[in-house]
């Protein structure tokens, strides 16, 4: 199944191309170097989803040599930096991607997630709240709601956790995606567990597991969550 992140990025690229070139089909008439850079970005995004970070990095670096301000390349490189633990560099690329194209909401979501990893919890929550207040496209709104739900259900700093709001956000995200996104359903399960509703948590975790096309990694994670909920335990919070 194509990830929500991939769908949102593709949608954003199409929106950007439409704004810049007037219509999507005009891509075939863009300068050769621009087409080459976008093709490299597409390849890098695909390789990153497959876990081939080294190849993704080579392609995105090549794209940025062609056009140092190409926001999709900056966003993808930010994802690579995050995987490498280079959080400050990732944030810099998110900032620049947003400067080049303020509509790249995915860069803002990635930045919020990185801030959570850096324990900048107040800044992360502010970013989620701001994004949701913008009422972005449905797919992007669902992602923002689900990410905020995860934050409020699992934040290592208990003062930022809000189980009831997390459940509300996660249900809204699942509804937007008509209950077809397994990761969002799992987030709802985690949020229910945070409130102590382990029966609902187990039910939603089982629902996420039953989705067709889930990755082996996600299946492993969902099974671990289900086992915890059946024992009436929350997922461990990483300090």
Label each residue range with its predicted role.
Residues 160-161, 179-182, 187, 194-195, ...:
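Terminal, low-structured helical/coil segments at or just beyond the last alpha-helical repeat
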Residues 66, 100, 134-137, 176-177, ...:
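Structural marker of alpha-solenoid helical repeat scaffolds
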Residues 62-63, 96-97, 130-131, 173, ...:
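Canonical positions in the second alpha-helix
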Residues 50-59, 84-96, 118-130, 159-169, ...:
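Structural signature of tandem alpha-helical TPR/SEL1-like repeats
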């Amino acid at each position: 199944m194509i990830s929500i992140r991939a769908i949102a990025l593709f949608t954003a690229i199409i929106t950007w191309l439409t704004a810049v070139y007037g219509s999507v089909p005009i891509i075939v008439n863009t300068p050769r170097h621009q087409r080459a850079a976008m093709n490299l970005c597409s390849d890098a995004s695909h390789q990153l989803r497959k876990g081939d970070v080294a190849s993704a990095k080579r392609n995105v670096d090549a794209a940025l040599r062609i056009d140092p301000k190409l926001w999709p390349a900056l966003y993808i490189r930010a994802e690579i930096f995050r995987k490498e633990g280079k959080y400050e560099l990732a944030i810099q690329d998110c900032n620049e991607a947003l400067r080049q194209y303020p509509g790249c909401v995915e860069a803002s979501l990635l930045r919020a997630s990185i801030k959570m990893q850096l324990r900048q919890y107040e800044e992360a929550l502010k970013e989620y709240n701001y994004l949701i207040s913008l009422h972005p496209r449905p797919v992007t709104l669902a992602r923002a709601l689900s990410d905020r739900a995860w934050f409020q259900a699992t934040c290592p700093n208990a003062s930022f956790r809000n189980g009831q709001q997390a459940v509300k956000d996660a249900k809204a995200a699942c509804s937007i995606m008509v209950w077809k996104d397994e990761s969002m359903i799992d987030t709802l399960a985690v949020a229910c567990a945070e409130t102590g509703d382990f029966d609902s948590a187990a039910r939603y975790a089982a629902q996420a597991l039953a989705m067709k096309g889930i990755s082996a990694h996600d299946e492993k994670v969902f099974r671990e969550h289900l086992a915890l909920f059946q024992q009436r335990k929350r997922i461990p919070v990483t300090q």
